């Protein structure tokens, strides 16, 4: 798949199509489809709105169960390929999403703040919750996008938090629709980049100080607009929302003429996804379990559309990288949740968070099937 920023269709102003997917039971014995040489299995099931993942130094998998307000530990005690033990790591959170292990602590982002918990390497349990960011540093949440995801800079001196907008296409007060930078010790932070309607997954490219984000763009301009995207994020960069999209393409109506000085410097993203695909998870593959050609490439979960007359997404895709930049479009990696191209889409899974397990396999959270899937290479090299 390749979408050119120079060949976008004309906007269909005020065209919104409510076309929510419908949850279907998983067909008996059904598994997602993966490329030849790979195998997929259930690592854990019976979860409550499984969203984001992180992997601890001992191999424990932490999963954010958003609607349950908790972080759960999933442990494969005997190398079985399945979580044989689970327990609550942290509870009482306000829609937790991002999880990041750093320097002996597990950092968690929810709609109130970033919190951290001392990780006990002996048994994998958590110490008391410590609030890291200042009150309202992530905005006073009153509705809108709930995801607050985290990424530590490679030098460990700062961490970054993605904060989505409160609405589809209106001006929001900061820090909504931004990525913020915080000192490792926390505090109020500063605005790092703006004009990002709903940045969700954020990750640093391996071996670099370059931050990347996947972003959910606006709805209401027709099936063909606006492409969601993957982009590197520049300090001080402006990415269009709400005044323009994909660079200097002005939002129809008065909003597009309101801040010409910002539109003039709007950055074109690096790689575009099919509009309304809803990219949520981002993982750069650094393991060795997959063939060598996968190292340095990105996996992106496309959660799937709700605002397109023709459904799209509900899959995980691979983005090829060369010299630290995405190139050549993207390709399917894990599909099959969407039953027979139905419309409205009948789905038995929707992928969200991605993480590389300690053994190098790929873990995928599924907030419809309430599972964590595991993909591993079983072919010859």
Residue ranges of model-derived segments:
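Residue-level detector of Asp-centered blade-edge/turn motifs that repeat once per structural unit
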Residues: 55-59, 100-104, 152-156, 205-208, ...
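Beta-propeller domain segments
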Residues: 2-34, 147, 165-168, 174-177, ...
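Surface loop/turn motifs at the tips and blade-to-blade linkers of beta-strand repeat domains
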Residues: 42-47, 87-93, 132-142, 191-195, ...
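Conserved beta-propeller blade signature
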Residues: 60-64, 105-108, 158-162, 210-214, ...
């Amino acid at each position: 798949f390749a979408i050119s920023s120079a060949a976008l269709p004309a906007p269909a102003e005020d065209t919104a199509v409510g076309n929510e997917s419908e949850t279907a039971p998983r067909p008996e014995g059904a598994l997602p489809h993966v490329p030849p040489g790979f195998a997929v299995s259930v690592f854990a099931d019976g979860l409550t709105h499984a969203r984001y993942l992180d992997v601890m130094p001992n191999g424990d998998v932490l999963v954010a169960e958003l609607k349950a307000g908790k972080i759960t530990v999933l442990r494969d005690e005997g190398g079985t390929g399945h979580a044989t033990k689970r327990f609550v790591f942290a509870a009482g959170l306000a829609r937790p999403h991002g999880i990041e292990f750093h320097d002996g602590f597990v950092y968690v982002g929810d709609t109130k703040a970033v919190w951290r918990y001392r990780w006990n390497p002996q048994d994998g349990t958590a110490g008391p919750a410590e609030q890291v960011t200042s009150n309202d540093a992530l905005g006073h949440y009153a509705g809108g996008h709930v995801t607050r995801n985290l990424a530590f800079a490679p030098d460990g001196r700062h961490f970054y938090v993605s904060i989505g907008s409160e609405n589809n296409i209106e001006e929001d007060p900061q820090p909504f629709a931004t990525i913020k930078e915080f000192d490792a010790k926390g505090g109020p932070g500063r605005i790092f980049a703006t004009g990002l309607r709903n940045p969700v997954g954020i990750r640093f490219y391996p071996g670099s100080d370059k931050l990347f984000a996947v972003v959910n763009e606006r709805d209401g301009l027709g099936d063909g607009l606006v492409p969601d995207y993957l982009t590197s994020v520049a300090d001080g960069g402006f990415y269009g929302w709400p005044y323009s999209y994909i660079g200097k393409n002005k939002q129809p109506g008065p909003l597009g003429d309101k801040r010409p000085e910002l539109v003039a410097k709007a950055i074109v993203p690096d790689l575009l996804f099919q509009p309304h695909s809803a990219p949520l998870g981002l993982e750069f593959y650094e393991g060795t379990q997959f063939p060598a050609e996968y190292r340095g490439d990105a996996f992106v979960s496309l959660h799937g559309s709700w605002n397109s007359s023709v459904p799209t997404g509900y899959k995980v895709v691979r983005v090829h990288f060369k010299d630290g930049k995405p190139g050549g479009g993207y390709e399917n990696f894990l599909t099959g949740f969407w039953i027979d191209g139905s419309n409205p889409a009948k789905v038995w899974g929707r992928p969200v968070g991605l993480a590389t397990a300690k053994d190098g396999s790929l873990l995928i959270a599924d907030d419809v099937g309430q599972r964590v899937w595991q993909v591993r290479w079983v072919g010859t090299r």
